[in-house]
């Protein structure tokens, strides 16, 4: 089944491309969600008439995502968790915890936007975490995990100033 993409879809194509997909994927997913149109002559003409509008919407989304990325550029999230003697956490810190900490600091981030390629964080330390705000826009934040016991002497001086960013 040939379809016209109305937005960029990972591993498939970008806005305006005509691609072949399995009929079920096109009929049951892409077309009902408004991500594509069947590639008929009438739909191709409709798309070409709306092409500039769709490209402007895409550019606007990228600009908004870039603004959010700029706001997240220098963010350092400090989280405290119970840990053992070797710095291993009792439990873990995942995307939900990081999203909650960012939301509490006034930055709206959905947990689906946070990417932890190696899984949840299970050790005390500093981690660079990517936040995928748009297909083309990714921000990186620093997540610092400290022990609730207060055994981190080197970071205790900075806690008073960075505590508000949590």
From Swiss-Prot:
Keyword RNA-binding among record annotations: yes
Keywords: Ribonucleoprotein, Ribosomal protein, RNA-binding, rRNA-binding
An example Gene Ontology CC term for this record: ribonucleoprotein complex
GO biological process terms held by the UniProt record: translation
One GO MF term: rRNA binding
Record InterPro entries: Ribosomal_bL9, Ribosomal_bL9/RNase_H1_N, Ribosomal_bL9_bac/chp, Ribosomal_bL9_C, Ribosomal_bL9_C_sf, Ribosomal_bL9_N, Ribosomal_bL9_N_sf
Top-rank taxon: Bacteria
Keyword Iron-sulfur part of the UniProt annotation: no
Matching SUPFAM superfamilies: L9 N-domain-like (SSF55658), Ribosomal protein L9 C-domain (SSF55653)
Similarity remark: Belongs to the bacterial ribosomal protein bL9 family.
Primary role: Binds to the 23S rRNA.
UniProt-recorded name of the protein: Large ribosomal subunit protein bL9
Gene name as annotated: rplI
